[in-house]
Amino acid sequence: MLKITKIKRKIMNSIKIKLSLIANLIAIFALIVLGIVSFYFTKTSLHEAALKNQTDLLKVTQSTVEDFRSTNQSFTRALEKDIANLPYQSLVTEENIINNVGPILKYYRHSINALNVYLGLTNGKVLLSQKSNDAKMPELRDDLDIKTKNWYQEALKTNDIFVTPAYLDANLKQYVITYSKAIYKDGKIIGVLGIDIPSEDLQELVAATPGNTFLFDRENKIFAATNKELLNPSIDHSPILNAYKTHGNYNFFTYGLDGKERLGTCTKVFTYTACISESADIINKPIHKAAFIQVIIVIVVVIFSVILLYFIVSKYLSPLAAIQTG
């Protein structure tokens, strides 16, 4: 009789283990499927959030460039208006122009900290106020051949302000952006106003923006960046430029740089190309962290479920065991 009882107990224990195993396998499978689905949506959500963050950072840089241009254009219009509002007699002779326009040019140059502010006359001479020669009042010069300059010619072609791309000024030996505007009085051309702003001003504004953003000029050279190491002309930026040409404005792409995968996006801002780039590892780091946390949670839940289900199965099979032994 004792032997039969032991056999029955072994059978019941075997049933408990098998039922517990089946229940646990079902639970484990369900938890794994749930974990995979949850991770997929978490990964998608985190990835989209990372891309949106990068897009927002690039838009900050775009707004910075647009505000920089808008500020300088407003300044140019204000100066044009002050000169055009002078009595016509103040603008008919070179001496009158020097005496009446000269102080205005110097005042405006000081107010915006420009490198040069000048008025190119139709006879080829230019009234020039220079930061490098601040002690002197603006003087009239005829050795700069202004009629051949792009800022002079383009300003005469348009009724609006002409803005040059950043370029290396041969006299200043530094990169500048020129804002120019033709000035008319009573329907007659007085001259072309020019303002040279150092591109360093834009560089400082871009450097203060968040994210790894940078600006290419029309020759595809970086002249402004949050990371000044990118200004090194020896760095090959063709991978990101080629990827941008393929994908277009505000479309993300991956590219290789120094053997590492990077994620980037670009957009046109006037004549510039503004880009933001980040290591794919940095973008994926929160995703991998979330995956690790979810794996730990699934393992803990599986272990807890195995133990819990075993005791539940044991409890509900206990009456059956008592009947069989009784």
Q: What residues fall within each predicted segment?
A:
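Extreme N-terminal signal-anchor transmembrane helix of membrane signaling/transducer proteins, especially
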Residues: 2-52, 295-303
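Extracytoplasmic/periplasmic sensory segments of membrane signal-transduction proteins
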Residues: 4-5, 52-60, 64-160
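Cytoplasm-proximal transmembrane signaling helix
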Residues: 20, 24, 28, 215, ...
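Juxtamembrane interface helices immediately C-terminal to a transmembrane segment
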Residues: 20-21, 38-57, 61-68, 89, ...
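Solvent-exposed, extracytoplasmic
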Residues: 98-111, 188, 192-230
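Extracytoplasmic/periplasmic ligand-binding sensor regions of membrane-associated signaling proteins
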Residues: 110-111, 122, 128-197, 202-205, ...
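Membrane-proximal, non-catalytic sensory/regulatory domains of signal-transducing membrane proteins
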Residues: 151-184, 210-214, 218-219, 236-270, ...
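Short, hydrophobic beta-strand elements of compact beta-sandwich sensory domains
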Residues: 179, 191-198, 263-290
